[in-house]
């Protein structure tokens, strides 16, 4: 894979670069495009009802001057894909990997990862889009500040881990990429797909040889809510931190992991920048969706 950077002079420009790539991917798999100033947006997933009301989405729609005509929430992919009212759909956990096989047209990023986080609908039908790969790449490149990490460690095995792995391979094709998760079977699938080393949490210190990764990424849901932090974290977090290294937590909430990383002297980014980039992609897709 050839190196492709999104990094620009500042954060807003980097987000715009991610949006351009996301739009271009959709146009590469469908002929013809149009524009729309209004949208009915659907959502599916554990936090979809909250996301549909969220400020980050509404800020992005306002920036693109898209009028939100309504929102609809569904409990499963069958209900979502069987409803004709919506023009754009947010696909959140745990459905990102389950929805992809049900959509005949996928963007290259969605096809490479098997992950769909957004569906855009036009006259030619529905297209499954992976905005998260572009958004996470924008976030990680911003956090690295133009430097190339010596190693990247991704914690987790769900849909987001696949998106982040693809983003790493686009930004830094030759980087040492490592994955660790309790679900070793799911972990092995994305590790093989993106030429990464992998192991369970217990073997991680040995694999790293006690050399913390330059860029540490948490794609797990630990830290997403107060309740999630009630259980012990699966990893020895202190052994993964090092002063001056980078920690990217996909969770928007300021979690205990982020606090620990800051106390260890790391450069820390929450998931908010990534979510702003994701929603910027979604709003732009709604504005310029296929007809």
Specify the residue positions occupied by each region the protein language model found.
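Phosphate/diphosphate ligand-binding glycine-rich loop within oxidoreductases
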Residues: 1-144, 254
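Adenosine-phosphate binding glycine-rich loop
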Residues: 2-26, 64, 243-291
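Conserved hydrophobic helix-helix packing surfaces used for dimerization/oligomerization
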Residues: 17, 38-42, 152, 177, ...
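Short, conserved loop/helix-junction motifs that constitute active-site signature segments
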Residues: 32-35, 145-148, 169-173, 209, ...
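Glycine-rich adenosine-cofactor-binding loop
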Residues: 45, 130-133, 140, 144, ...
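Conserved S-adenosyl-L-methionine
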Residues: 170-176, 264-267
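NAD(P)-binding Rossmann-fold cofactor-contacting core
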Residues: 173-194
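Rossmann-like adenosine-cofactor binding region
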Residues: 194-269
């Amino acid at each position: 894979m050839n190196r492709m950077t999104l990094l620009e002079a500042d954060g807003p420009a980097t987000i715009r670069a991610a949006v351009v790539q996301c739009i271009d991917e959709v146009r590469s798999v469908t002929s013809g495009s149009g524009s729309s100033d209004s949208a009915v947006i659907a959502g599916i997933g554990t936090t979809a009802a909250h996301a549909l009301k969220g400020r980050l989405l509404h800020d992005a729609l306002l920036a693109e001057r898209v009028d939100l005509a309504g929102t609809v929430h569904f409990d499963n992919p069958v209900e979502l894909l069987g409803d004709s009212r919506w023009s754009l759909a947010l696909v959140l956990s745990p459905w990102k990997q389950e929805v992809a096989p049900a959509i005949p047209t996928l963007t290259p990023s969605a096809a490479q990862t098997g992950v769909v986080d957004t569906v855009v609908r036009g006259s030619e039908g529905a297209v499954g889009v992976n905005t998260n790969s572009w958004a996470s790449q924008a976030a990680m490149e911003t956090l690295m500040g133009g430097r190339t990490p010596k190693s990247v460690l991704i914690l987790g095995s769900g849909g987001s881990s696949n998106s982040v792995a693809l983003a790493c391979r686009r930004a830094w094709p030759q980087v040492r990429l490592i994955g660790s998760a309790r679900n070793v079977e799911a972990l092995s699938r994305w590790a093989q797909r993106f030429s990464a080393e992998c192991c369970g949490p217990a073997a991680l210190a040995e694999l790293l040889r006690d050399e913390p990764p330059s860029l540490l990424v948490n794609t797990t849901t630990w830290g997403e809510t107060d309740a999630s932090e009630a259980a012990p974290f699966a990893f020895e977090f202190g052994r993964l931190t090092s002063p001056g290294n980078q920690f990217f937590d996909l969770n928007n909430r300021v979690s205990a992991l982020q606090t620990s990383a800051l106390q260890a002297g790391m450069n820390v980014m929450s998931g908010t920048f990534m979510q702003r980039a994701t929603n910027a992609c979604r709003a732009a897709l709604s504005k310029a969706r296929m007809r």
